[in-house]
């Protein structure tokens, strides 16, 4: 029995399911999860000492590569001054100022510790600002695990959603409408029926939780026009896409100014840090200025802020995103060519340093499209690559990530392994 198996058995005896976040359990792909001992650059090593080229990137934060020396030094210096104060620091002002410079839609910003906190509070803030209760989210978009957002589609068009997790009362989700992503007709009908009651619309502007799904230009335009017309708050959940698909996030690519933005992952440089921000008039409804309550003992933690500030400095350097985008495109094009040569039905897409792999003829436009892809083929591909030292997220529904540490040569090596795997799948 190898170390991964030993540790998984040990973990299951004390941690529910053996993991602290469900996707890590390998439940959707089968097998034993790899317990990671260390990470550096584009690589991770498991407890057996096996090295993997990593395209998980801690689910997005590791944009500059794991254990980047400058980030590690910033964390070390900050830690020497104390781990947590429960009081304001200059660093939290500095990171808020930096984010506001990068994202013009962010006039005011509040730091929290997780993406779930950010989206949960943004929803509360939108409701407090508008005095309305109903919200719109889209099937397949994930916005953390707060009760009002753990919702799946109802039984019919524009019916209110049902809880997607045990322990969530139906009353908590009765104000949540779940619509199909990229479906403008549903969006228009929802506002026609309930426009005066809708507090906000929240979406992933590139969906990373049903692999990678792009919004159409018309869909994005309709979102902005309808929310403005009806006085609803448009929330871009950029926890995954912020600073990942472009320096200014998805909103900079769409040319959209959302009313509120949630962010996380990259802004913490691998440490627990997230934020929500946006229009001054909305943000000033938050306590202590307004009646919408939010607080957190570790919000703006100085160690996480130090990691985030250094990461933001690195990604703003000349050529960073041009190189990141080129490497990601090199990867997905290599995969397309390899799959086509093997006669495997497959396509791939990317934006910035984020990519999606689909065992289907066309990239999905919504959750239903993604659900029709060949999930079994993904499982075979996942294990074929993992067995050869290449790590992807253990779910067909998760996007992948490239970092600045992935060199062109390393991408070529990954594609060469994919050629072997696709040939084996076709045999």
Swiss-Prot record:
Its cofactor is pyridoxal 5'-phosphate. It is found in: Cytoplasm. It is an enzyme of class 5 (isomerase). Gene3D superfamilies: Aspartate Aminotransferase, domain 1 (3.90.1150.10), Type I PLP-dependent aspartate aminotransferase-like (Major domain) (3.40.640.10). GO terms for cellular component: cytoplasm. The modification N6-(pyridoxal phosphate)lysine is found at residue 265. It catalyses: (S)-4-amino-5-oxopentanoate = 5-aminolevulinate. Keywords: Cytoplasm, Isomerase, Porphyrin biosynthesis, Pyridoxal phosphate. Pathway: Porphyrin-containing compound metabolism; protoporphyrin-IX biosynthesis; 5-aminolevulinate from L-glutamyl-tRNA(Glu): step 2/2. Its main location: cytoplasm. GO terms for molecular function: glutamate-1-semialdehyde 2,1-aminomutase activity; pyridoxal phosphate binding; transaminase activity. Its EC number is 5.4.3.8. PROSITE patterns: AA_TRANSFER_CLASS_3. Pfam families: Aminotran_3. One of its GO terms (biological process) is protoporphyrinogen IX biosynthetic process. Belongs to the class-III pyridoxal-phosphate-dependent aminotransferase family. HemL subfamily. NCBIfam families: hemL, PRK00062.1. PANTHER family: GLUTAMATE-1-SEMIALDEHYDE 2,1-AMINOMUTASE, GLUTAMATE-1-SEMIALDEHYDE 2,1-AMINOMUTASE 1, CHLOROPLASTIC-RELATED. Homodimer. This is Glutamate-1-semialdehyde 2,1-aminomutase.
